[in-house]
Design a protein with these regions (language model features):
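Conserved small/polar residues in nucleotide/adenosyl-binding loops
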Residues: 7-12, 239-240
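Duplex nucleic acid-engaging cores and interfaces of nucleic-acid transaction enzymes
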Residues: 17, 27, 31-238
């Protein structure tokens, strides 16, 4: 009977909707707990401003909440943290200002303790800048947007493996926007890559991403700007 099957269909739809609402509610409860943890962690550091509290409390996007938290997250011993402990944060700040044409007169002051020489000082300062850029919400959003709009996945068969890779024939010379690539295709391509039969690349590549971030952070064309540019290129690998 049609009305019975329609009625059963409606019941099933309602059950699905109830399940979806329950899942959504569970996720929101988890996020609320996570936000409490984040707020208390930042408060313990003495860095919780009223504006920061408001931003975290008002956001119900898990990715955004984690991005806001990232600069305050207790860190493992990173290269940037090691550089800070060597007293190189003021040098990183100096480089970021990008006002100095030459650094010759500034660098000797930072060569002390565990800092071996001027190049070591610059490397540490670049590590600090790279970490700051990688934790900057604007930078992360820029790369995310670039990937969602432009990312293209390309696969080619590894030379000489054509016979062995026969089951991946569809992907011997394949290219498609990543957002249109179905999950089963993506899994097959990744499997072919892990078996050493397909060569896979996803663009925009690191160079394009670095170019976008350089537009955001690099001003002028002096020695400081060049150092910041190098740090920004390093930051791209942090943000992947």
């Amino acid at each position: 009977d049609r009305s019975v099957s329609r009625g059963l269909g409606d019941v099933y739809k309602r059950q699905v909707q109830i399940g979806e609402i329950r899942d959504r509610n569970d996720k929101l409860c988890e996020l609320a707990k996570r936000k409490e943890t984040i707020l208390s962690t930042i408060e313990e550091q003495g860095k919780l401003t009223e504006e920061l509290r408001k931003r975290i409390e008002q956001s119900w996007d898990a990715t955004e909440v984690e991005d806001i938290y990232l600069p305050y997250k207790p860190k493992r011993k990173t290269r940037a943290e090691a550089a800070r402990q060597k007293g190189l944060e003021p040098l990183a700040t100096l480089l970021l200002l990008q006002r100095e044409n030459h650094l010759d007169s500034r660098l000797p002051a930072f060569v002390k303790g565990d800092v071996k020489d001027e190049e070591d000082a610059l490397k540490g300062a670049r590590d600090i800048i790279a970490e700051q850029v990688s934790e900057d919400e604007r930078a992360r959003n820029q790369l995310r947007n670039q990937f969602s709009r432009q990312a293209v996945i390309t696969s080619k068969v590894v030379k000489g493996k054509e016979e062995e890779a026969a089951k991946y024939r569809d992907y011997f010379d394949f290219s498609e926007p990543l957002k249109r690539c179905s999950s089963h295709r993506l899994l097959a391509i990744r499997r072919g890559e892990s078996e050493g039969l397909l060569k896979v690349s996803i663009s925009p590549d690191d160079e394009e991403c670095a170019g976008r971030l350089e537009q955001m952070y690099v001003r002028g064309n002096n020695e400081c700007s060049r150092q910041v540019g190098e740090a920004v290129r390093d930051a791209v690998s942090y943000t992947h």
